[in-house]
Amino acid sequence: CASLCFALQSPRFIGTDQAFSKRGTLLQWFPEKLATIENLNNVPSAISHDVYMHCSYDIAENKHWVKKALNQVIRRHLLKGGWTDRDVTKLGEHNGKPVMVVLLEHFHSSHSIYRTHSTSMIAARERFHLIGVGNEAVDAAGQAVFDEFHLLKGDNIFSKLNELKEICEKNGAAVLYMPSIGMDLTTIFASN
């Protein structure tokens, strides 16, 4: 049942009034049920970001409740998989500035997230040593925003999260900033 709900929640485009109504009905019913799922092992977790993101297109006041439930399941999944949070009592500096690690989604020159956030991140370099972390989609313009850029190379979510944690620990990051959450699995999992 949860897999079917994931599949029905994931499309970006809902082309008929009837389909829109059905998705809205699911958004009212599903969060409470989703919150009871122990982990992501038996649901199509590869489309979790679609469930997370596309609820925003509904009109109900509580349309985002599915995010809360999904976050609860993700957190349990991470902990069951052996995840431990980073020790944030050890903060470092680089050239007298605190370190800000920025986890990116779709941060390339032709995407709106680049256009809306690159100038503020460039300005943040005055007060922070800025480290960008992202995948191959981050183009040269996106990488140039940062003092340094690290490409996430992991082949699964745990390896990507561990790589991100290593970057934060090695540099004593004072801030982990995600300018967007929901277009990619990595940011959703990192927020948990």
For each of these PLM feature ranges, what is it?
Residues 1-99, 143-145:
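Non-catalytic membrane-proximal stalk/linker segments that position and tether the catalytic domains
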Residues 102, 167-183:
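Short N-terminal targeting/anchoring amphipathic segment
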Residues 103-118:
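A short, glycine/small-residue-rich beta-strand->loop->alpha-helix junction that serves as a flexible
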Residues 104, 134-136, 178:
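Short beta-strand/turn micro-motifs composed of small residues
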Residues 106-110, 156-157, 182-185:
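Short acidic, S/G/P-rich loop/turn micro-motifs used as interaction or catalytic elements
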Residues 126-159:
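N-terminal strand-loop element at the rim of the active site
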Residues 155-171:
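Donor nucleotide-activated moiety binding/catalytic core segment of transferases
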Residues 176, 185-186, 190-192:
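Catalytic core of nucleotide-activated saccharide and alditol-phosphate transferases
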